[in-house]
Amino acid sequence: MQITVREALRDAMQEEMLRDEKVFVIGEEVAEYQGAYKVTQGLLEQFGSKRVIDTPITEYGFAGLAVGAAFAGLRPIVEFMTFNFAMQAFDHIVNSAAKTHYMSGGQVKCPIVFRGPNGAASRVAAQHSQNYTACYSHIPGLKVVAPYSAEDHKGLMLTAIRDDNPVIFLENEILYGHSFDVPDIIEPIPFSKAKILKEGSNVTIVTFSIQVKLALDVVNILQNDNIDCELIDLRTIKPLDTDSIIESVKKTNRLVIVEEGWFFAGVGASIASIVMKEAFDYLDAPIEIVSGKDVPLPYAVNLEKLAMPSANDLIEAVKKVCYYSI
């Protein structure tokens, strides 16, 4: 059976809304319009306007309302049309949702999911293309999820909705329409559990979200050059499955990290720091990070491609750590 990422997310929300009457969806155009990307299609008809709530165009307003509802014991799912717009709600996310459980001595929980597309799509320019994975991962009190496959989107969304802590659920606009094989029943997937998509012996490639597709393509290309790659899909950025990364590096002795976001203070830099501390003696080459260029993402299609990680960038990085003649 195949389903799209869009359908996987919808199924997860529907199942949890049926299971727990405290779960509700709130955001711009999630009800009457059925979601900017049709992720919430059909939920209004099934659950009504008290549990699928359209809002004015004010992320600061509806995010704050949802955080308050979570403090009161409900389980909101907040849809941002894009995480670029979530900057308007940053205060509520960082200073209220992420901090209150700690500051209340554990007396006040905040079971809330903030979800929506993150990163580049296709020619939506600099203000709609930013990648916030590293930004949210930097904040104590937030859990950060960035899946690739439909099964992982559903399984991790089930876990996110049931979690008593705020979860940043980072999707990708381009992936919404992608279809994947899925089992008949998808169970909740625990956080902090990476997936090894391919085992290998020469080099470890670590990535997440839509960059998994790029890495899968490159792994097949490099196989023709007798470079055997191990590919790890992180799925959860925070908490991070450090053990899977370290064990893989101990086996392959080389590491390349791929992320769409910027290099400086990025996810890749954090992983590299951990590996240097925990597995330095196992490394046969310096760690390579393939990332987006340190520029606002251009609108022009030719420049947009140059600013994003490419297959050639990854191939070059892998061959470099393998001391392969390029």
Curated annotation (Swiss-Prot):
E.C. number: 1.2.4.1
Keywords, alphabetical: Oxidoreductase, Pyruvate, Thiamine pyrophosphate
Listed cofactors: thiamine diphosphate
Binding of thiamine diphosphate, residues: E59
GO biological process, one term: pyruvate decarboxylation to acetyl-CoA
Record's catalysed reaction(s): N(6)-[(R)-lipoyl]-L-lysyl-[protein] + pyruvate + H(+) = N(6)-[(R)-S(8)-acetyldihydrolipoyl]-L-lysyl-[protein] + CO2
Signal peptide start and end residues: none
Any one Pfam family match given in the protein's UniProt record, by short name: Transketolase_C
EC category name: oxidoreductase
SUPFAM superfamilies, per the entry: Thiamin diphosphate-binding fold (THDP-binding), TK C-terminal domain-like
GO MF annotation list: pyruvate dehydrogenase (acetyl-transferring) activity
Role of this protein: The pyruvate dehydrogenase complex catalyzes the overall conversion of pyruvate to acetyl-CoA and CO(2). It contains multiple copies of three enzymatic components: pyruvate dehydrogenase (E1), dihydrolipoamide acetyltransferase (E2) and lipoamide dehydrogenase (E3).
Subunit composition and interactions: Heterodimer of an alpha and a beta chain.
Name assigned to this protein: Pyruvate dehydrogenase E1 component subunit beta
Natural source organism: Rickettsia prowazekii (strain Madrid E)
Gene: pdhB
